[in-house]
Amino acid sequence: MAARIQQSPQPGGGKRKGKAQYVQAKRARRWDGGGPRQLEPGIQGILITCNMNERKCVEEAYSLLNEYGDDMYGPEKFADKDQQPSGSEGEDDDVEAALKKEVGDIKASTEMRLRRFQSVESGANNVVFIRTLGIEPEKLVHHILQDIYKTKKKKTRVILRMLPISGTCKAFLEDMKKYAETFLEPWFKAPNKGTFQIVYKSRNNSHMNREEVIKELAGIVGSLNSENKVDLSNPQYTVVVEIIKAVCCLSVVKDYMLFRKYNLQEVVKSAKDLSQLNPKQAAQTGNGKEAKLESGDKSSQNDPAEGKNNQQVVPENSEELGPTESISETHVVNEGVAKPELASQVTEGSESNENDL
C-alpha cells in the first residue's frame, strides 16, 4: 500500500523532461556517423570569424571553399544515390529492399563523414570551424587570399578572417610544447630557417598564460635552428596560436601582413586604401607595417569574437622574444585609429585576448 502511494504521484506530479533534453538527444542521434561534432584535438580545418551571423557565415564558407577546393583538388566524388531500391519488386523483396536501404543509409553517413569540408561547433560565439579532410588548409586559404588580393573581387559579406588550422592539441602548456616540437619542424628545423612572429589569441579559456605560451614557442623555434630570427614588420612566417576552451589550434602561414591578417574584407580594398594614405603612412605600410582602416575598426567593434576595446601591446623584453631578440621598452597603442602593425595584440574582453610576437 505504501509502495502504491509513493508511485501514484509520479505520472502526474513527477518531474517532466524538458524540451532541451529531447532536442539534445535528437541532435546526438543525428550526428551519429557524421564525424566529430565539435572542435577537438587531432583534426585540421579552417577557423573563420564572422559578425553576428554564423549560419550565413557557414553558407559563405562552404561556397568559397568548395569553389577553390574544386579548383585545386578537383570536384568531390560521391556514391550514386540513384542505386537505392524502388520497393516495387513484390512483397517477397520487401525485407531485402529494407536491408539495402539500411546499407545505403550507412554508406551515406560514411560519405558524410568523409566530406571534404564539414562544419563543427567551435565553442565560441561568432567563430566557425570547418573541418577539412584530404587537403592542406594553409595552402588552400593562401590560394584564396592570393586570388582575392589580385582580383580585388569581394566574394563574402559576413566572413571576416579565415585562418588555416594545420593541427590541434590540448590547450595545456606541456601538451602544447610536446606537440609544437614536431609540428614546427617543417618550417624551422635546420636546414630550414626564416624570420617569424607569433600571433596569440584565446577565447573562453582562463588557465593559459599568453606570456608563457609565447616564451615557450619562441624558445622551440630558436632551438630548431639558431638562425631563425624574430621579425615584427614583415616576417616570412607567422605562427598562429588560437585557443578555444581546452583546444589549441596551430598553424604557420605566409604573407600574414600582406593579406591584412588574413582578413577577407580588408584584402579586397587594401590597394584603394593605400592610395589614400599620406606618404608617411604609405611608407610604413610598404615596409610591411599594417595600418588599421576605418572599416576594419568597425568590424572589430561589432565582432565580440575579436574583442571589444582591443589594444596592441608590444612585448619587448628578452623573456617574451626568446633567445633571438631583446628590446627594452613596451608601448601601448589604442586600436581606434590608423597605425602601424605592432608586435602584439591583446583583447581585454572577458573571453579573449590576442598577442603578436
Swiss-Prot record:
Residues annotated as region Disordered? Answer: 1-38, 74-95, 276-357
- Give the N-acetylalanine positions (modified residues): A2
> Which PROSITE patterns does the entry mention?
THUMP (PS51165)
Q: Which UniProt keywords apply?
A: Acetylation, Phosphoprotein
Keyword Acetylation, does the record have it? yes
Gene Ontology BP terms? tRNA modification
- Biological classification of the source: Eukaryota, Metazoa, Chordata, Craniata, Vertebrata
Q: Which domain of life is it from?
A: Eukaryota
Query: What GO molecular function annotation could you give as one example from this UniProt entry?
Result: RNA binding
* Role summary: Functions as a tRNA-binding adapter to mediate NAT10-dependent tRNA acetylation modifying cytidine to N4-acetylcytidine (ac4C).
Q: Which Gene3D superfamilies has this protein been placed in?
A: THUMP superfamily (3.30.2300.10)
Residues annotated with Phosphoserine modification:
S8, S86, S88, S119, S270
Q: Which Pfam families match?
A: THUMP (PF02926)
What is the recorded name of this protein? THUMP domain-containing protein 1
Species whose genome carries this gene = Bos taurus (Bovine)
Per the record, the similarity remark reads:
Belongs to the THUMPD1 family.
Residue ranges annotated for the THUMP domain, each copy included: 147-254
Q: How does it assemble?
A: Interacts with NAT10. Binds tRNA.
Tell me which positions the record assigns to the signal sequence. Answer: none
Q: Where is the composition biased (Polar residues)?
A: 1-10, 276-287, 298-315
- Keyword Acetylation appears in the UniProt entry: yes
